[in-house]
């Protein structure tokens, strides 16, 4: 079994979620050891919420869960890449497919590059 280095990074490691078919980066979150183990056990992406200080099963409220299709780890065993099937079409809590829906050109204000899939005000009441 792979041993991830949670100690090097203060107990949390970066976890990148990528669409398993297109390769599009959907989001960056963090995992502690409990989130890592839950992800391995369930096959569903589970992260550690830094704001709530608790485990967070992606999509638990919105229904936009991430089914893990493949897991890769980096050369230092301190970053995880999850190749996922994004259910419901949106990974971002603001209702977009990707959390990286804004583009910056030459330091100007960000430009929204995607259409919103859902209204977060209706989903997160």
Curated annotation (Swiss-Prot):
Localization of this protein: Cytoplasm
Listed Gene3D superfamilies: Phosphoribosyl-AMP cyclohydrolase
Keyword Amino-acid biosynthesis: yes
Record GO cellular component, one term: cytoplasm
Requisite cofactors: Mg(2+); Zn(2+)
Disulfide bonds: none
A Pfam family matched in the record: PRA-CH
Record note on cofactor: Binds 1 Mg(2+) ion per subunit. Binds 1 zinc ion per subunit.
HAMAP family from the UniProt entry: HisI
Subunit structure: Homodimer.
Stated family: Belongs to the PRA-CH family.
Protein name: Phosphoribosyl-AMP cyclohydrolase
Gene name of the encoded protein: hisI
